[in-house]
């Protein structure tokens, strides 16, 4: 279909008008004053207070992650992420506020690592998977990450700088 001068896919409403409507009282994305880490801000009234609760509330048998022939439901992903979270806490001493670097391709494990880290109050440091050893070293040093979760290719790169 070719649009004439009188037809348009663009609404006359501005982005600001739409946002104001969606975030107004009694609307799906109502914003209310709140505090996050001691800082006053606006937050979604109906949102779970933490990502951990969001992940927990999302548990179901619906497929969540599909990669090649691998399929994980929301529930399976939650269980796998919980296992990783326990390792981060019990074996590596990760506590809320600690940074955990994630360096890998777009594998299902990336999502699980993010879920695990944020569910225990950690800060996920997403590292560029294309970074070379020197860039990885800078990212790790600059972020203050206590742990690196990486795939085999990134671990091989990390091995070149690990002795520092």
Residue ranges of each PLM-predicted region?
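Flexible, non-catalytic linker and terminal segments flanking ANL/adenylate-forming cores
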Residues: 1-47
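Structural core segment of the AMP-binding/adenylate-forming
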Residues: 2-20, 119-164
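Flexible acidic/glycine-rich loop/turn elements at helix↔coil and beta-strand↔loop transitions
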Residues: 23, 54-61
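Solvent-exposed, flexible loop/coil residues
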Residues: 26, 33-35, 46-48, 76, ...
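Residue-level signal for pocket-adjacent positions within structured domains
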Residues: 37, 60, 122-125
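Conserved AMP-binding/adenylate-forming core of the ANL superfamily
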Residues: 42-47, 52, 61-115, 132-138
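Alpha-helix C-cap/termination motif
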Residues: 57-58, 91, 142, 164
């Amino acid at each position: 279909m070719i649009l004439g001068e009188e037809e348009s896919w663009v609404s006359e409403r501005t982005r600001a008008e739409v946002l104001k409507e969606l975030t107004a009282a009694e609307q799906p994305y109502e914003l209310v004053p709140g505090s996050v880490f001691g800082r006053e801000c606006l937050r979604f009234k109906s949102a779970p207070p933490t990502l951990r609760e969001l992940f927990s509330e999302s548990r179901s048998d619906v497929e969540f992650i599909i990669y090649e022939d691998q399929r994980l439901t929301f529930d399976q992903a939650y269980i796998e992420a919980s296992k990783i979270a326990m390792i981060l806490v019990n074996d590596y001493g990760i506590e809320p506020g600690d940074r955990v670097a994630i360096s890998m391709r777009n594998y299902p494990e990336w999502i699980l690592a993010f879920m695990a880290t944020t569910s225990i109050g950690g800060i996920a440091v997403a590292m560029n998977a294309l970074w070379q050893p020197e860039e990885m070293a800078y990212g790790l040093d600059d972020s203050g990450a206590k742990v690196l979760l990486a795939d085999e290719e990134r671990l091989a790169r990390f091995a070149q700088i690990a002795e520092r």
